[in-house]
Amino acid sequence: MGKSFSHLPLHSNKEDGYDGMTSTENIRNGLVNGEVHNEDGRSGDVSQFPYVEFTGRDSVTCPTCQGTGRIPRGQENQLVALIPYSDQRLRPRRTKLYVMASVFVCLLLSGLAVFFLFPRSIDVKYIGVKSAYVSYDVQKRTIYLNITNTLNITNNNYYSVEVENITAQVQFSKTVIGKARLNNITSIGPLDMKQIDYTVPTVIAEEMSYMFDFCTLLTIKVHNIVLMMQVTVTTTYFGHSEQISQERYQYVDCGRNTTYHLGQSEYLNVLQPQQ
């Protein structure tokens, strides 16, 4: 022992006292720190360290969780988390791709809607006179002529249309000799066609009674007269009404009952009599 102390420097009593106090405090601190480290090793729970906010030199306990690191129950929908603007969650990948895909889908749906809902024409085609029934009133010198015609109506739209009514009249020598109107006829499906037969009753009398002699003349086999047929078809779709009108001249035999072969006439039609 003496040999070991011979190498120690000599100090004053004051310094020796200070060193003694320092050594004692260091020993105590070492024991305290050792106990703390042992407790940390045993528990291994880091939750005992409070959550604090560092604001430079000082630190402030988090007011939300009160330093516990746990959010109070029932406040999950009331608290807002702040994240940096540069966080990748604010800039998800493929955003442009999703936006472009959404725009493309919207444009595609709009284009399809315009294509299928865009109004197209409704074609009215006269097929010909189907039959003509003739009767006479000899005393009144009157001719009764009922003309049945065939009309094709084609719907070129991708939705159904309603044929609301068909009106027609027949003129002979600039005089109206017959009228007819047919209501609530039928519905035509998308890209479909329907054929409609209708009859217009006509009367040739009074100032045109001279035609009675012509139509009953036995020396003539064919008693054709020229009649002007006027027809108007009214269709509706999506609350919109559309009218299609046509007029043509038709040869009709007023001397006998006649049945015609459809497709051989180039003239127009008329319809069923008004009620």
Swiss-Prot record:
Belongs to the TMEM106 family. Residues 1-24 are annotated as: Disordered. The keyword Ribosomal protein does not apply. In neurons, involved in the transport of late endosomes/lysosomes. May be involved in dendrite morphogenesis and maintenance by regulating lysosomal trafficking. May act as a molecular brake for retrograde transport of late endosomes/lysosomes, possibly via its interaction with MAP6. In motoneurons, may mediate the axonal transport of lysosomes and axonal sorting at the initial segment. GO terms for biological process: dendrite morphogenesis; lysosomal transport; lysosome localization; lysosome organization. Keywords: Cell membrane, Disulfide bond, Endosome, Glycoprotein, Lipoprotein, Lysosome, Membrane, Myristate, Signal-anchor, Transmembrane, Transmembrane helix, Transport. GO terms for molecular function: ATPase binding. SUPFAM superfamilies: LEA14-like. Disulfide bonds join C215-C254. Residues 119-275 are lumenal. The chain crosses the membrane at residues 98-118. It comes from Bos taurus. This is Transmembrane protein 106B. It is found in: Late endosome membrane; Lysosome membrane; Cell membrane. Its main location: membrane. Can form homomers. Interacts (via N-terminus) with MAP6 (via C-terminus). Interacts (via C-terminus) with the vacuolar-type ATPase subunit ATP6AP1. Interacts (via N-terminus) with AP2M1 and CLTC. Interacts with TMEM106C.
